[in-house]
From Swiss-Prot:
A GO cellular-component term linked to this record: host cell nucleus
Composition bias, Basic residues: 256-270, 320-330
Family statement: Belongs to the papillomaviridae E2 protein family.
Name listed for the protein in its UniProt record: Regulatory protein E2
Keyword set, alphabetical order: Activator, DNA replication, DNA-binding, Early protein, Host nucleus, Phosphoprotein, Repressor, Transcription, Transcription regulation
UniProt entry tagged with the keyword Transcription regulation: yes
UniProt biased composition (Low complexity): 227-239, 309-319
Modification after translation: Phosphorylated.
Assembly with partners or alone: Binds DNA as homodimer. Interacts with protein E1; this interaction greatly increases E1 DNA-binding activity. Interacts with protein L1; this interaction enhances E2-dependent replication and transcription activation. Interacts with protein L2; this interaction inhibits E2 transcriptional activity but not DNA replication function E2. Interacts with protein E7; this interaction inhibits E7 oncogenic activity. Interacts with host TAF1; this interaction modulates E2-dependent transcriptional regulation. Interacts with host BRD4; this interaction mediates E2 transcriptional activation function.
Region annotation (Transactivation domain) ranges: 1-201
Species annotation: Human papillomavirus 17
Function field: Plays a role in the initiation of viral DNA replication. A dimer of E2 interacts with a dimer of E1 in order to improve specificity of E1 DNA binding activity. Once the complex recognizes and binds DNA at specific sites, the E2 dimer is removed from DNA. E2 also regulates viral transcription through binding to the E2RE response element (5'-ACCNNNNNNGGT-3') present in multiple copies in the regulatory regions of the viral genome. Activates or represses transcription depending on E2RE's position with regards to proximal promoter elements including the TATA-box.
Subcellular localization: Host nucleus
Amino acid sequence: MDNLSERFNVLQENLMDIYESGQEDIETQIKHWQLLRQEQVLFYYARKNGVMRVGYQPVPPLATSEAKAKDAIGMVLLLQSLQKSPYGKEPWTLTQTSLETVRSPPANCFKKGPQNIEVMFDNDPENLMSYTVWSFIYYQNLDDTWNKVEGRVDYHGAYYMEGSLKVYYIQFEVDAARFGKTGRWEVHVNEDTIFAPVTSSSPAAGEGTDASPINAASRSSPARGLSATSVSTRTTQRTSPRRYRRKASSPTATTTRHKRQDIRRSRSTSRGRQAISRGGERRQRRRERSYSRDSSRSPNRGRGGSSGGPTTRSQSRSLSRSRSRSRSRSRGSSAGGGVAPEQVGKSVRSVGRNPGGRLTRLLEEARDPPVILLRGEANKLKCFRYRAKKRYGSLVKYYSTTWSWVGANTNDRIGRSRMLLAFNTYDERELFIQKMKLPPGVDWSLGHLDDL
């Protein structure tokens, strides 16, 4: 059991090194899939011998481990074949070599340059579908030779050229029969309408569904192919994707056009301004009510008022502060003369209830605990926390979970994820800064808190 845990920890360390390095070469991607295969083999062996947990990781069923191990073997073979081709020297990322990307249409091909297009059925802006097309597609022919072609879009769907044949991996006619009524549709790439809505003239049922002759597009009047790369270079001024929102896939549920969204946004902003103005009036009324209540109650509660008039909470606080200052002057020698500037932030322990008095407590609490705020992607921060706990030992007192800011009026996350690291002393924080090695794309800033 201990031997299995040690092997599993070594595999996890190697995987973390790959994720943090961010290398974009095919050798690293092959190593990544080989490690994933070894991980599933270890799980399979553990489950077969009755071990239900390796370290903190539950062991999946035998069928799950077997299926994932076979997927990893298949990916290793594909990548090793691609490595021997001229395209093996191109940069390859974890996303481009993931199982999900390889299995997405067109299946068993590598792709680069994803781009979203929209198809409107029945000329109805509410009946809109979104599809993912690719700028470049890498496929194997019958001789197991890799070829790189450009992805294209026409009225019938998204395709690429395999020799003299069009290989369609998305056909709009299929979804037109499901979601449309008239058999008409428009194709929109970015902000451009490529084709006017005409009756579909897709290949006949007797022809192949995956590939149609290259002159099949001549059967419709607006039939003209459009390269995915040319579209992306021609119209790049599109609204940036919203963070933490659901991204469009191929296909998603129906969406609305941008013009309707702009109208709704303008209406919502006008309503929001009205709501803000109403909210300001309500807050003003609450302040007036709270002031009247404080004025009516303060003669009974105020202790130090010389004239007996209304005393607010802020006035009572100022009076208590003046009393504490007068007491501290009378016993200044016992308080130790205050906290030196270099001592502020030197303690992280919360001051307990002691007979030293309020001034002693305030002086002790002036030493605030130091922290470091990290900003970056959630997965990178979690990986860094996992490694830092083993690498830096007791230098860090506490690690927070990942969190994000949200807006005052919405629940949408703002910016990147955050993580806090708390330390016992400033010296330990400085030592940690000298030793720490952050993943790419993660930055940091210093701070301190009143209490942890």
